[in-house]
UniProtKB/Swiss-Prot annotation:
This is Serine hydroxymethyltransferase. The keyword Metal-binding does not apply. The record marks H225 as: Plays an important role in substrate specificity. Catalyzes the reversible interconversion of serine and glycine with tetrahydrofolate (THF) serving as the one-carbon carrier. This reaction serves as the major source of one-carbon groups required for the biosynthesis of purines, thymidylate, methionine, and other important biomolecules. Also exhibits THF-independent aldolase activity toward beta-hydroxyamino acids, producing glycine and aldehydes, via a retro-aldol mechanism. (6S)-5,6,7,8-tetrahydrofolate binds at L117, G121, H122, L123, S349, P350, F351. GO terms for molecular function: glycine hydroxymethyltransferase activity; pyridoxal phosphate binding. Its cofactor is pyridoxal 5'-phosphate.
Length: 412
């Protein structure tokens, strides 16, 4: 930071303030995590200077012999970690990984059957405001209204009726195990391809705490942050025979030069994820989520699907007569960061919402365990029961700040 402070004090101030926010607040946004010092060091290296259009051994620029080493390390580690024949580590984000995968499997105006955004899907699974909804014909499936679980019978019926060329499984706000074998069976019945977006659960899949989609999906995409705890970026996994077409759809299809400093950081994160300590970490992520779920259920809060099998919970606040927007604001005042989130069969705008999504990856990285999550749950309950009581929220904030400062940002 020394050079930033000297050369750009305005930016330095923003970074310092953000550092303080991350230290002093409890991060419960399910898609966020805390990268290790090694990951961040790799991302800030001199590799950022190097253009490397193409792939290892087949570049359009000279001088790529050392960045080739970095990219090959990331590729081989990804393949080993997920037991995949092929890996592309160049996508700049999960959205670009999905875009490249779509173009590798189908054509514009083809039909995609994907999960409804308000039921837990993702923008890139067919939202009309996203490229996926603009370039492709979209049919959406959802969850059962009574159980909150993916309605596989509905998926099968919609597939039979609309004959999509591609079925997308995976979610951004679904707290239960996904049965990829059922999705593949449905896809095979109608001759469709199956894409699995495992961005949220990649860390759990890597440690065998969630069934792997690799044996079932024609292509699997993921981000490299979230539960995988790496730099922000994307990745594609598939069979060797799909490699050539996927590579061409990423470069030159939708990207130019890869970000070699980020790819180096991906290599570091994938190496970290192969260690025994990462398995212990992921187990704790789930234990913490289940503890949080139990405490909130006991306090009278409604959880979509009644609980969680993974790293996140989706809280429907309708019975509390609180909007997600107001809950997010109150919790932020109390020192707890969450995001407002639509819930299945949502009646409010996505800028207001009826729910909040919370997750445990970041707090688990800081070293919190089940006992600590009971405290966190109590603060959440108290804050949401007093959303208009600024004095109470400020008091919680003081307690949260003192508590949070007992934990380093990265403890693994």
């Amino acid at each position: 930071m020394d050079q930033i402070i000297l050369q750009d004090p305005e930016l330095a101030q923003a970074i310092i303030l953000e550092s303080g926010r991350q230290i002093d607040k409890l991060e419960l946004i399910a898609s966020e995590n805390i990268a290790s010092t090694a990951v961040r060091e790799a991302q800030s290296t001199i590799l950022t200077n190097k253009y490397a259009e193409g792939y290892p051994g087949k570049r359009y620029y000279g001088g790529c012999e050392y960045v080739d080493i970095a990219e090959n390390l990331a590729i081989e580690r990804a393949k080993a970690l997920f037991h995949s024949e092929y890996a592309n580590v160049q996508p700049h984000s999960g959205s670009q990984a999905n875009m490249g995968a779509y173009f590798a499997l189908i054509k514009p105006r083809d039909t995609i059957l994907g999960m409804n955004l308000s039921h837990g899907g993702h923008l890139t699974h067919g939202s009309p405001v996203n490229f996926s909804g603009r370039l492709f014909n979209i049919v959406s499936y959802g969850v059962n209204k009574e159980t909150g679980l993916i309605d596989y019978e509905e998926v099968a019926k919609l597939a039979e009726k609309h004959k999509p060329q591609l079925i997308v499984a995976g979610a951004s706000a679904y707290p239960r195990i996904i049965d990829f074998s059922k999705f593949r069976s449905i896809a095979d019945t109608i001759g469709a391809k199956l894409l699995v977006d495992m961005a949220h659960i990649a860390g759990l899949v890597a440690t065998n705490l969630h069934p792997s989609p690799i044996p079932y999906a024609h292509i699997t995409t993921t981000t490299t942050h979230k539960t995988l705890r790496g730099p922000r970026g994307g990745m594609i996994l598939s069979t060797e025979d799909m490699g050539k077409v996927i590579n061409s759809q990423i470069f030159p299809g939708i990207q130019g030069g890869p970000l070699m400093h980020v790819i180096a950081a991906k290599a570091v994160a994938l190496g970290e994820a192969s260690k025994a300590s990462f398995v212990t970490y992921q187990k704790q992520v789930i234990l913490n989520a289940k503890t949080l779920a139990k405490q909130l259920l006991d306090a009278g809060f409604n959880l979509v699907s009644g609980g969680t099998d993974n790293h996140l919970l989706l809280i429907d606040l309708t019975n509390k007569k609180i909007t997600g927007k107001d809950a997010e604001k109150a919790l932020d005042q109390a020192g707890i960061t969450v995001n407002k989130n639509t819930v299945p069969f949502e009646t409010l705008s996505p800028f207001v919402t009826s729910g909040i999504r919370i997750g445990t990856p970041a707090l688990t990285t800081r070293g919190l365990c089940e006992q600590d999550m009971i405290k966190v749950a109590n603060w959440i309950v108290t804050a949401l029961n007093n959303i208009n009581n600024e004095t109470q929220l400020k008091e919680i904030n003081k307690e949260v700040t003192y508590f949070a400062r007992q934990f380093p940002l990265f403890s693994w």
